């Protein structure tokens, strides 16, 4: 049975800069590193994202793909927060990209946007009790 999403993985150009972003701006913690078994060189940095979830950062990214809303494939990652204004303040205070300031979406949830050093779009979302996501989760809880 599926338990959830275990991780999202990204190739990164500058590991130090990426780790600093995910720790300082996003508030995650670096968990551990994995080295290449055949060479002992750094390979993957694991960022703890809460629960059983991680973000994998792979060394050696070189080919940038220009972002477009029309691209097929990865579109953005959403991070759930408990206070959207506090999350936005952290983005501003760390001089991270301020793509979209906090606003309430059509789904009644609060959202703001940034992107990581490699241009991966990140939505931060404070779920509303009136939003379809929370209503669905509550409906599942009532079945237990």
Features from the language model and the residues they span:
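Hydrophobic side chains in well-ordered alpha-helices
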Residues: 18-21, 87-91
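N-terminal beta-strand motif that seeds the catalytic metal site of vicinal oxygen chelate
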Residues: 1-17, 74-79, 128-144
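A short, acidic/glycine-rich surface segment
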Residues: 32-33, 41-42, 62-67, 100, ...
